[in-house]
Amino acid sequence: MPSRPRIVSVLLPQPLPEPFDYELPETLNAGPGSFVTVSLGPREVTGVVWAERATPSNRKLKPVQDVIGAPGLSANMRSFIERAAKYICAPSGMVLAMAMRSREALDEPPVETLVVRTGDTPPRMTPAREQALAQATEPMSGAELARKAGVSPGVVKGLLEAGALMHVERSLDPPFPLPDPALPAKQLTGEQAETSAYLRGMVREATFRAALLDGVTGSGKTEVYFEAIAEALQDPEAQVLVLLPEIALTQAVTSRFEDRFGVAPAEWHSAAGSSARRRVWREVAAGRARIVVGARSALFLPFAKLRLIIVDEEHDQSYKQEDGVLYHARDLAVLRASVEQCAIILASATPSLETLHNAQAGKYVHLRLHARPGVATLPQIALADMRVEPPETGRWIGPQLAGAIEQTLAAKEQALLFLNRRGYAPLVICRACGERLKAPDTDSWLVEHRYTGRLVCHLTGFTMEKPLACPHCGARGSLTGVGPGVERLAEEVHTRFRGARVEILSSDTVASADDLRSLIARMETGAIDILIGTQIVAKGHNFPTLTLVGVVDADAGLRGGDLRAGERTFQLLLQVAGRAGRADRPGRAIIQTYAPESPAIALLAAGDRDAFIAHELDQRRLVGFPPYGRLGAVILSAPTAEQVDDAARMLSEGQPNAAGIDVWGPAPAPITILRGRHRRRFLVRSDRNVDLSSFLAAWKERVKLPSAVRMTLDVEPYSFM
């Protein structure tokens, strides 16, 4: 009697809602988690066996083509993918695609062929052979051995034939060196030691626990969570994931890991090359990469035994992915820790209100570090009211900040000027006709970058040379930049503080990790007097002689209708101000503002974080916004305004009735046209006890939209553009 064919469900990294069934030939062996190649229409694609079906199918099924020898996805990883997909209202296949984004990782790493001694003596020994064997102290290529020994390649070939040497293969992806948790740590203060002891105990429990590590800038949060990492590494199979919000911060923190654990961690971020990603992915899957430091996408690596997750700077909005699959890495990190039954530490000097609320509700343990170690003190913060003391026409630095810069330079100390606008000018207009230059097919202003002589759309990446004449009216020489960017600020600084060594730190001026390391080294050694930067300067860089921080336009983040505008402004300015003063040098921050009475600005200057948090929570509670409710966004786009408006009407009419849910819209998105597509938005608010994800998914299922219309669901949106 013929054996019953095995049926496997294969999830594909495609925008598909569920796995497809395939027949597994008797010649192949695969189980849940195995990577396989299958046919999808005319194409051959790679997927993952999601389950094995006990009942045969009545349909003729395509066979699995092949089984790939890469380490499979664990049951925990598959569960995480399914639960994450449900939470963020995305097809499971698209979440799987994030776990498979390094396609080359599924291939066996390339190998090199080397020669080594066997220990046997050749029957005939010559001086040349003797020389070659004497040099063969470690594996190397035959050509390298011949060169090193000063003999011909034929001598090496003869030793191989005689059995005195043999070929061995070595992977070009070597294992990562093992970290040593027993290396001596920095001396901790009493407060730090008490906090680290609690975290160590939490890790030892080997179950899901979450802690908020809430410490002022410079309080030693990194040193404290290092001890939790050391505790996790006592288990020789344990792995640790440290998430960081920026590639820049990944580079800055690597040396600190080396100092504590003797080796650099494995790094995972978009700047890594394909071979580096292959190496990290496979070593993580095999359980040999013990500490992984990475950006948000590292969350989707296939860890074999994840025992601790750390989300550093957990408040940072760059943890929210705003294109492709929309998710917040902090929220999914908590979900992954729950699935893996491991500890998670959320660290920040300015925690998000959502995380603080969870700590207040007892879901997370709240651990606080109140002081900087040693004699270091927090910087003094002063407000410069620009309504009272405005800068001169055409300038952006007011008299109070200018005087402080002069004092700082005279004391041979460093200043940091913060302006969160890239480029030279955020807007280019024609003086003749008033036209504002926009990106093609997009409601987004073009930003002037004078260093490159180009106009850039920071939303779509469109770039063009600055035209000599206005494209609208043809007037020559009429285009002018309006408002300051970091390049324009640098121009003013060069003019006003002659002789000062000035550099800009932004994503435009730092093209690579090496560029960033070089700039940071110059700052650390005092080769820069004034550093001008965007928000990248707020993240984790400590400069010993930086004593002055100047915020050029504190009000920029308060403009617009973003519900988190005040929170984000407070967090960012507190982080930036915290760069000033370390060791025995007291720091100060001067914040230029036209709205000193704004709660975010006034309470920042007063140093009263708790009062600001209470104020923001009160405002959110009144309207049921996060953390007291949940938000979702539905974004529709289509080639024409008529198409998107028709789709919005269809969606409105198909809205399910549900208690505890409010729907606002449709309304034109603030960026009404993006890449030639017209956009409309709905905003959905739900009570905390309502399953918002299920509501959004059900709403999407109820309405069949035309193929020209795209619908995007965003759970807990951070951008309302």
Q: Positions of the model-derived regions?
A:
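Accessory, non-ATPase domains that flank or precede helicase/AAA+ motor cores in DNA-metabolism machines
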Residues: M1-S348, T355, Q360-A376, L409-A410, ...
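Flexible beta-alpha connector loops of hexameric P-loop NTPases
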Residues: P71, P265-S274, D316-Y327, R387-R395, ...
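Accessory helical-bundle/CTD segments and flexible terminal tails appended to RecA-like ATPase motors
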Residues: R101-D120, A382, R387, G434-R436, ...
